[in-house]
Amino acid sequence: MAQVQQLTPAQQAALRNQQAMAANLQARQIVLQQSYPVIQQVETQTFDPANRSVFDVTPANVGIVKGFLVKVTAAITNNHATEAVALTDFGPANLVQRVIYYDPDNQRHTETSGWHLHFVNTAKQGAPFLSSMVTDSPIKYGDVMNVIDAPATIAAGATGELTMYYWVPLAYSETDLTGAVLANVPQSKQRLKLEFANNNTAFAAVGANPLEAIYQGAGAADCEFEEISYTVYQSYLDQLPVGQNGYILPLIDLSTLYNLENSAQAGLTPNVDFVVQYANLYRYLSTIAVFDNGGSFNAGTDINYLSQRTANFSDTRKLDPKTWAAQTRRRIATDFPKGVYYCDNRDKPIYTLQYGNVGFVVNPKTVNQNARLLMGYEYFTSRTELVNAGTISTT
């Protein structure tokens, strides 16, 4: 009689993990097939940012939340007698300065800037977020609705109207619920914190650092917001399917955090590798580096090369700025603004057990006074691993 081969503890753990993943995928498919997708307005406000610029939005505690669409409109008046102002490279992406989301368990998810949110939205869409495409069709397709809109300049004495949209993701995508939040918890509440630009941050004088500004120019000191309005729409799945033991839920999806986060690094030296370490136990999907060279943002002329490097000093990619941009064009079919470098790892996320096993490397050619590197991360982590995970590197 043949002996039954016993599984080793490692094999048993692998089998349990495989079974859990299969059950999660099956539950996800049932939820997507049987629940109802809803997008619902949960809050709208109009305000003067000179008086208040930070707001806490309370989303609806219903269903499985996939994310939030935030619409922002603003009116800006240039009160200067003669001088105009012009859009900065980041422009209306800076209408929102910071976004933070807390789930019903008070667990923080995304905490990042408006520009980082917009750039990740662009990378995942494969084109500038919510922008129309040029077509030679005789049918009048095109930029009919001005969905994202801002005047290139605001003349002296004139008022400009701006419209901007942000997608704040909780789930990874419409069909991949990794990171989604179960909000059917009446006793608790979610919180979406929005910090908007104000008269001190939105307008940069000539020669000032335009990183957080929307407009820059000689007339900047006399520019002001007339008002800002925002509307938040919650995207969620309602009427969740029910089985014998209650709701059918993709438990692994709901126990995973999908986060966007950013940090700032200083201390760069010309022609010396500057290494930013990836924290352990996160699965990094993308990295965005913005080289703020003391207020100058250049098209790669101040960088020798960029790299992702493992602990044994092997470069998984090491490219000059132009070749790095060529890789980016394969993802979004265009370039990001000057000084912005995008690294895509979503096909094979970076995942390390030890802090410092993988680093993002920038070797600058020139470094101006007050130069810094702004890092934006997109990653997964599980709630169980979060206890032991490292913190995002910053200086």
From Swiss-Prot:
InterPro entries: Phage_PRD1_P3 (IPR015108), Phage_PRD1_P3_N (IPR016115), Viral_coat (IPR029053), VP_dsDNA_II (IPR016112). It comes from the Viruses. Pfam families: Phage_Capsid_P3. Its main location: virion. It is found in: Virion. Keywords: Capsid protein, Virion. One of its GO terms (cellular component) is viral capsid. Homotrimer. Major capsid protein self-assembles to form an icosahedral capsid with a pseudo T=25 symmetry, about 66 nm in diameter, and consisting of 240 capsid proteins trimers. The capsid encapsulates an inner membrane and the genomic dsDNA genome. The major coat protein P3 and two assembly factors (P10 and P17) are needed during the assembly of the virus particle inside the host cell, when the capsid protein multimers are capable of enclosing the host-derived membrane, containing the virus-encoded membrane-associated proteins. This is Major capsid protein P3. It comes from Enterobacteria phage PRD1 (Bacteriophage PRD1).
